[in-house]
Amino acid sequence: MPTETLTPPPSPSSDQTLIEQFRAKALADAPAHELLQSMRDMMAGAGPAQADEFIRVMESYYEKNLNEAAERLQAENVQQQLLKLSWPFTEDQLTGIEDKSVRMLVEQTLAGGYKLDTAEGMVFPVVDYGKLLINGEQVSTAMKAYLSLMAMESDARSASDAALVITWDELTKRTLAAESYVMTFPDSPERQKAEDRFIQYLQYYLTGMDNTPIFGTGYKVLPDLKTHYEQTAVAHSGTITGQLTRELLDILNTTGDAVAAKNKNGDEVYVAEYAAFRDSLESKARAALPGS
């Protein structure tokens, strides 16, 4: 009776060979759309550890080549056509790009794992982590959580032109997600990037931005934001975010909610207690993380 011949699963050594082949292709600066497709083809059948390595190679490629991808979109005729589109940009708008060469350039950019964004009258590419999440079922739990964290920002950036462009609720959600990643996967190779994202979000939340200050009239913290802080401190008291929010609330209680004032020269300065909190926020947050 004839028997069916089964194809053996890929061995660790064959997986490693594929990873090295992919790494060589990335180092040779293959076009992003070709490289992303190669990654998906080569990842088929790979185990989580090997799949993670493919993602890391792809991310390193993006870090190296993002500026070059941006330069390809900087030609005046390209910018003019892209700025005519509705923003935020969606792929169904491709047909609205009149110039065929510009349309093909944008199609290749999107196929390479980028998405388009705009600020200060310029269009530029950003890495679309949501496209890397397409392979989320193949990678490890830690890598999938990392890609999900990074996709929050690539799906909807948190800040633009020194101003917060998401809600305080969404910012808190992202801050807690970044903290949770570091606490859950402290030894992950992606830990440092997640930690830096946590610090960035935490500073936005507790110190504001140039064009989104946390204070209003009389240099006092915005009442609605203080209420938000109080809710965060209670609901997330076991987190670093919640504990540092409580520390800020304690300071506000001693300053009458003031975070700044005018000195004798009429210059705006932070009150001493709040200034000390701002200056030490990053070091305190990092020190509270595991392995710091």
Residue ranges and their predicted role:
Residues 1-67:
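N-terminal mature-domain "stem" immediately C-terminal to a signal peptide or N-terminal signal-anchor/transmembrane
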Residues 10-14, 24-31, 46, 50, ...:
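Extracytoplasmic/periplasmic, Sec-exported soluble proteins
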Residues 16-19, 36, 175-182, 191, ...:
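Extracytoplasmic/secreted envelope proteins and their assembly/folding machinery
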Residues 45-49, 133-139, 181-192, 232-243:
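Short solvent-exposed coil/turn linkers within tandem alpha-helical repeat scaffolds
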Residues 56-179, 185:
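Acidic/His-rich structured neighborhood in mature extracellular/periplasmic domains
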Residues 78-115, 191-203, 245-255, 266-274:
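TPR/TPR-like alpha-solenoid helical repeat scaffolds
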Residues 153-220, 224:
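Flexible, glycine-rich surface segments
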Residues 203, 215-292:
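A cross-kingdom marker for long, charged
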